[in-house]
Amino acid sequence: MTDVDVAKNLHQVLECLPDGVRLVAISKYHPAEYIQEAYDEGQRVFGESHEQELKVKVATLPNDIEWHFIGHLQTNKVKYIAPYISMIEAVDSLRLLREIDKQAARNNRVIDVLLELHIAQEATKYGLTIDQCRQLLEDGEWRKMPNVRIAGLMMMASNVDDEEQIRREMTIAADFFDEVKSKYFTDDD
């Protein structure tokens, strides 16, 4: 038993989620014991942001865990996570997308990705501008990458107290998502 009631905390969060929403439990910096407790309660999707920590956890925890890589990913680190990562949640360049495709192919896998948008008005955030993302999709090179599947978009709102600013940024992201889905992914769910 750990000093944190993982099961209680997990169930409190799960009770608040709408139908159809899957929780990605952020496990970075948390010991394997906490992850195992969440796993024992039925949680199967976990998010990590450091490849060394992820490698250790993959080796010691159940092999049916679905691992997501969250946060900024350097191109030279893709080869270390490609054997076991299910999704990369922050793809911020065509160069990174190419490397993910290359490393996924080397591991005979398809890796899901989310294209990261930089909408927040903070220099500390990564991502593609809407115009850059639109251009990446329009150019179509991603369609020739059989080992990568663009599963959606992600963005981080500005870390501010101004709820109106956050709403505006989320509205921009939602509107762009609708545009992307209707223009490039009409045959997908």
Locate the predicted segments by residue.
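Conserved alpha/beta-domain cores
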Residues: 1-189
